[in-house]
Amino acid sequence: MSQRPNPSALIWLLLSALVVGLDQWSKAWVLSSLPEYTPVPVIDGFWNWYRTYNTGAAFSFLSDAGGWQLWFFTALAVGISGLLAFWLSRTARGQWRSALPYALVIGGAIGNVIDRLMHGHVVDFIQWYIGSHTWPSFNIADSAIVGGAIGIAVFGLFDKSDKQQPGTGNLR
């Protein structure tokens, strides 16, 4: 008698789609409503809307590299998203500690890929600062990628469900 396979975590790709949708909706709002390179205060002394563009990666890494970085970061994001989607397909639906961060990274990566392909750069608009110390501008996709990466690291370090139980020789 064959055992029915566990449903995969691919349903979590709906979260990825939600991240992409919110990211693209927010960027459409930014492009239609905010002036370029002009702070619009949200919370004085801490948070502005600030429409800017990034042709590189996090913290504008390689933004002045001459154009090849557009295709490099696009290919990297698509490759990582594909790998994470494959891992989702091999993950049980209830394994949210793996599925949630994978889905967040996929959604964020695809959101920024859409920007790169449509605009040639990523649209950033959230600016946090204290006094004269400003954090680099970012967007919803970036937030999802960072949240997912933190989740992968934290749950990977502290989740013992896949580890061998001491003295039993059996996996949990």
From Swiss-Prot:
| Record's catalysed reaction(s) | Release of signal peptides from bacterial membrane prolipoproteins. Hydrolyzes -Xaa-Yaa-Zaa-|-(S,diacylglyceryl)Cys-, in which Xaa is hydrophobic (preferably Leu), and Yaa (Ala or Ser) and Zaa (Gly or Ala) have small, neutral side chains
Subcellular location, in the record's words? Cell inner membrane
| UniProt keyword terms in alphabetical order | Aspartyl protease, Cell inner membrane, Cell membrane, Hydrolase, Membrane, Protease, Transmembrane, Transmembrane helix
Care to name a GO molecular-function term for this sequence?
Answer: aspartic-type endopeptidase activity
Give the stretches traversing the membrane. 10-30, 68-88, 98-118, 138-158
What does UniProt list as catalytic? Answer: D124, D142
Topology in the lipid bilayer is annotated as: Multi-pass membrane protein
Classification via InterPro entries: Peptidase_A8 (IPR001872)
Q: Which family does it belong to?
A: Belongs to the peptidase A8 family.
Q: What does this protein do?
A: This protein specifically catalyzes the removal of signal peptides from prolipoproteins.
Q: What is this protein called?
A: Lipoprotein signal peptidase
Q: Which gene encodes it?
A: lspA
